Amino acid sequence: MPDPYAWLQNSLLTIHRADWYRSVQAIQGRAGASVVLGGQEVINFASNDYLGLAGDERLIAAAVAATQEFGTGSTGSRLLSGHRELHGQLEKAIASWKQTEDALVFSSGYLANIGAIAALVGKRDLILSDQYNHSSLKNGAILSGATVREYSHCQVGELKTQLLEQRQNYRRCLILTDSVFSMDGDLCPLPDLLDLAEEFSCMLLVDEAHATGVMGETGAGCVEHFGCTGRQLIQIGTLSKALGSLGGYVTGSHNLIDYLRNRAPSWIYTTGLSPADTAAALAAINIAQQEPQHRMQLWHNVNYLRELLQKIPNLKLLPSASPILCFQLSSPSEALQVGKQLKQAGIFAPAIRPPTVPTSRIRISLMATHKASHIEKLVAVLQGLN
């Protein structure tokens, strides 16, 4: 009989030949702007720790205190033995920050997207999704069983055409978009999307994963940045990027959150977020709101790097309005080579390749804790490669 697992080796060979193969690299020590990777100290431009809070002593102290009081795990589903007062405090803090009625915390942002989408739509419904949306939005759409149609990246006119042609054929319609697109750094046209959602009686779900803590006057995200606070929509985000912890959230109306508590499978049938992660996220939200200097320093770094990168000839810098700056390369092999050369020079900014993105690139993420000297070294190395 043939080996039923033999195809795995052939698939891996195909991945290798396409220069799509991926493997993990262990970071040693605490998260920060400078880390040790494979025994080499490198400047870290690969992290989503935008405010530099993952190594903040206050988050660590909050996590330790919660572990000492409540133990290491939540021990069960939130609907059974896994709910702690800390979870409720975190949900209230998120809802207050976002100026919504209620919030629900999941064990990850990925689970928040999959669970919310699966609960909101089904076989009789339509999903319209930006083609560059995160994998969690795309997979959530597929798993929901709804009819899924993509529209070209940020093309509101094309989305409207699809709504005109198809909306009347379905019970419900859910529009899905990232607010900050994680592999490009650009922003969705949120006010226009909200206008279309209202015009065609659609739900709008916006993933604020890379905007939470970063965008808007108080760091509440792109909804705040665009002046759309208070308008009817579904906001999803993560606690694992600018907030330096782990977990995801959904925030919106009381009815929405109450419904998800009863219908979102990835919340109902999984263990609640650990006390340590919950307490760390709660501490991070307080810091993000009370200490705007972290966000101000982040944006100072973003603007400084963008200004310097624009002076490098032939660097194909992609449009961005966030701490994510990318420059495009011709092929996966070139991206891998540039990423390797950067690492040899003490810069950690790995290659991003298909199928994650349509075109290969180097993705640079800024942090509030980057120093001017870090940014200047990155630019000097890129100039040398160019």
UniProtKB/Swiss-Prot annotation:
Residues reported in the UniProt entry to bind substrate: 22, 134, 356
One of the protein's GO biological processes: biotin biosynthetic process
Gene3D superfamilies, alphabetized: Aspartate Aminotransferase, domain 1, Type I PLP-dependent aspartate aminotransferase-like (Major domain)
Source superkingdom: Bacteria
InterPro entries listed in its UniProt record: Aminotrans_II_pyridoxalP_BS, Aminotransferase_I/II_large, AON_synthase_class-II, AONS_Archaea/Proteobacteria, PyrdxlP-dep_Trfase, PyrdxlP-dep_Trfase_major, PyrdxlP-dep_Trfase_small
UniProt pathway annotation: Cofactor biosynthesis; biotin biosynthesis
Keywords: Biotin biosynthesis, Pyridoxal phosphate, Transferase
GO MF annotation terms: 8-amino-7-oxononanoate synthase activity; pyridoxal phosphate binding
Keyword Lipid metabolism applies: no
Residues binding pyridoxal 5'-phosphate: 109-110, 182, 207-210, 238-241
E.C. code: 2.3.1.47
Catalysed reactions, semicolon-separated: 6-carboxyhexanoyl-[ACP] + L-alanine + H(+) = (8S)-8-amino-7-oxononanoate + holo-[ACP] + CO2
Cofactor: pyridoxal 5'-phosphate
Sites of N6-(pyridoxal phosphate)lysine modification: 241
Similarity field: Belongs to the class-II pyridoxal-phosphate-dependent aminotransferase family. BioF subfamily.
Subunit relationships: Homodimer.
NCBIfam families (alphabetical): bioF (TIGR00858)
Family matches, as PANTHER family: 8-AMINO-7-OXONONANOATE SYNTHASE, CLASS II AMINOTRANSFERASE/8-AMINO-7-OXONONANOATE SYNTHASE
Function: Catalyzes the decarboxylative condensation of pimeloyl-[acyl-carrier protein] and L-alanine to produce 8-amino-7-oxononanoate (AON), [acyl-carrier protein], and carbon dioxide.
Name of the featured protein: Putative 8-amino-7-oxononanoate synthase
Species classification: Bacteria, Bacillati, Cyanobacteriota, Cyanophyceae, Nostocales
Gene this chain is encoded by: bioF
